[in-house]
Design a protein with these regions (language model features):
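Alpha/propeptide regions of enzymes that mature by internal proteolysis
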Residues: 1-324
């Protein structure tokens, strides 16, 4: 089987001046993840490696540089799933781990359980060699400013255009007092990262990592780390990672919805396109999806203005910011 790696850096209303940073981040993650596959590593190795790079890049809403909770802290969620045997590891609401995808790998390999939350997840990770950090190490000044701006605008009735785009915001901001307007395009929101891969053995894997939504309530868990919602992998169907507004994705169990359609005969592209249409038609949701079939066929879809994505194969690399 020819190995393939497919990753995303979040589906959202990405401003023009954020494109270059996303392209650099996607390229770096592809390089590291592909090195795992090229050297004979597993799909799980490649997914973990690629997601780790994006967690360490504060361009993305995962790991350091993530959105802040309502009370100004970072809380992280991640899931990793092996399609060969359905072994899965997930963590949520962790505040003192730099790389939650690595903690998810430990849960997958070292625990009879599937999912750990909060201090229990952190305790498990330290018992298996991970180092705890102070939450402030995950916070960047940009996100403090973003949180304050968001909360000011929320109080003034400014609509949240994280996923749908800025057209509504342009109109709405013109009606706001000047001190409440957001003129810096870097203060628009961004989202979750993820990866899917197939290795030389024909095994699939998927992983998703996120800092969640901006100004979320402390303790809120989104779709990213929930099996079948923001992430799923099964050699008998497909591997998927999602990004976007988590609550509608959870209600639809959208990741499993998509892989089931591949199992029923749809191509990954058909299933991804249909899933994102279903997300909007049923619940008005916005987001994106990467999907990989057991034969290495790919699907990429989003209904947000942009979604950063990248593909690595033995033939080369392909990157994009839109795919419709």
């Amino acid at each position: 089987m020819k190995p393939i790696l497919l990753i995303h850096g979040g589906a959202w209303a990405m401003p023009d001046d954020a494109i270059a940073a996303h392209e650099r981040g996607i390229a770096a993650a592809l390089a590291v993840g592909w090195k795992q596959l090229e050297s004979g590593g597993t799909a799980v190795d490649a997914v973990e490696a690629a997601v780790t790079v994006m967690e360490d890049d504060d361009t993305f809403d995962a790991g350091r540089g993530s959105f802040l909770t309502r009370d100004g802290r970072v809380q992280l969620d991640a899931l990793l799933m092996n399609g060969a045997d359905l072994k899965t590891g997930g963590v949520a609401c962790v505040e003192r781990l730099r790389n939650p995808i690595q903690a998810a790998r430990l849960v997958l390999e070292k625990s009879p359980h599937v999912y750990f939350v909060g201090s229990g997840a952190e305790r498990f990770a330290t018992q298996h060699g991970m180092r705890l950090i102070d939450n402030t190490e995950l916070i960047v000044p940009r996100e403090r400013e973003r949180l304050m701006a968001f909360q000011r605008n929320e109080a003034a009735g400014q609509p949240d255009t994280t996923f749908s785009g800025a057209d509504v915001a342009v109109i709405a901001q013109s009606t706001l007092p000047e001190e409440f307007r957001i003129d810096d395009p870097t203060l628009h929101s961004h989202d979750t990262v993820g990866a899917v891969a197939i290795d030389q053995f024909g095994n699939l894997a998927a992983g998703t990592s996120t800092g969640g939504t901006l100004s979320k309530a402390p303790g809120r868990v989104g779709d990213s780390s929930l099996i079948g919602c923001g992430c799923y992998a099964d050699n008998l169907s497909a591997a998927v990672s999602l990004t976007g507004w988590g609550e509608p994705i959870m209600k639809l169990v959208l990741g499993k919805w998509a892989v089931d359609r591949v199992a029923a005969g749809a191509t990954p592209q058909e299933a991804a396109t249909d899933a994102i249409a279903y997300l909007f038609d049923r619940l008005g949701g916005h987001g994106g999806m990467i999907l990989m079939g057991p034969d290495g066929s790919l699907g990429i879809a989003h209904n947000t203005p942009r979604m950063a994505w990248g593909i690595a194969t033995a033939e080369g690399r392909e990157l994009g910011i839109t795919r419709n």
